Amino acid sequence: MKAFMGDDFLLNSKTAVKLYREYAENMPIIDYHCHLSPKEIYENKTFATITEAWLYGDHYKWRIMRANGIEERCITGNASDEEKFFAWAKTVPMAIGNPLYSWTHLELQRWFGIYDVLNEKTAAAIWKKTNELLQGDGFGARDLILKSNVKVICTTDDPADALTYHELLKESDFPVQVLPGFRPDKGLDISSPGFADWVRSLESASGMAVSSYQSYLDALESRVRFFHNAGGRVSDHALDQMVYAETTEEEAARIFAAGLSGEHVSFEDEKKFKTRTLQYLCGLYAELDWAMQFHINALRNTNTNKFSSLGPDTGYDSINDERIAKPLARLLDSAEKKRQLPKTILYSLNPNDNYIIASMINSFQDGKTPGKIQFGTAWWFNDTKDGMLQQMRALSNMGLFSRFIGMLTDSRSFLSYPRHEYFRRLVCTLIGGWAEQGEAPYDMELLGKIVEGICYRNAEEYFRF
């Protein structure tokens, strides 16, 4: 029997252990998609308690606390930080089998040197020790990033953002690149009641009057170039439902005018507007050699009462099951026909889409850029041992796992970087297993190079930050 969360955690063969120790463990990190705050990084934010560092904003934890019967007061409510931590400690033993159980203990080990199991009996001692350490040196946001050997962070930013803290970080002595990620979801959601207000913010940020669809595209382009000048090389689109509908420039202009004036926009018109605007952005991203990310098939804010009382991103989302194959293929093809398909990373929240994406990406590789179209790492509800291995196996079966750009945190927490370790251990177990079973040669130079590529070097070459 293996020790709980011991040195060989998730490593199920001698080859896996060797690959991890010699090739994966000490590789740097490129976190090319996350939700960390550039302001908090710049200010080297510190944390008053482990609750603030661990539970504030973490809807992954909130979901299973509710499932464990914890009242909302101890999750997002006005309970003290100590009460909230003890509520989490009560939940953790019930979470065996959930990745949060592993991540919780991995983070306790790596950040705080705590190897005890977190439960109601150990909660008081762990509360005391973690808080003492957090008050000392070396636990600010920048410190945690540096300790994790992170080289690049890409945040998630609205096109109207001034990127003030990205610029301040660039001018500082902080050695990690903190770069903006262009997330124009509000600019594509033309049926939203807030669309017109967002266009006004785009006007203000760009310094351009927006009164027509063409002037809207011009303002978007100005913000893309602003992000580019600030070091941005990635965009991100939350496409909860993948859509595609051809339209003319004239019809897109009509739809834009309706949305800007607050008129009702039908779903069919929304599809046309999104398609036309995405096609335009594809060309712009391709020109600037950006990587475009699509996060597909999330079903958001499913609980109306909770959305009304707590708002979005509070743990009431789930997996969608919309069909993606035809609209996704048509959108990629429409860009490719114009030679305007940028580097693209595709993620779906629905694991039933794994083989759809894994097979589709190789229909659009260009024979020049290795892995130009990527099947993105297991995302959100799939960010588990099984989910990661399923994604990696689908990619291996359909394409080149060796060209995979690997892991990202997609996190709001500065303590989440051990998730890269979790991922890397699974990569080594998968590849090591192939060698152990005679499916790959026992060539450590070859296998080690593949491991290093997936952990770091492929992303370094792909993004060229």
Swiss-Prot record:
Stored Pfam families: UxaC
UniProt cross-references to NCBIfam families, sorted A to Z: PRK02925.1
SUPFAM superfamilies linked to this entry: Metallo-dependent hydrolases
- What keywords appear on the UniProt entry? Isomerase
Q: List the Gene Ontology MF annotations in alphabetical order.
A: glucuronate isomerase activity
Name of the gene: uxaC
Record InterPro entries: Metal_Hydrolase, Uronate_isomerase
This chain's protein is named Uronate isomerase
User: Record keywords: Isomerase included?
Assistant: yes
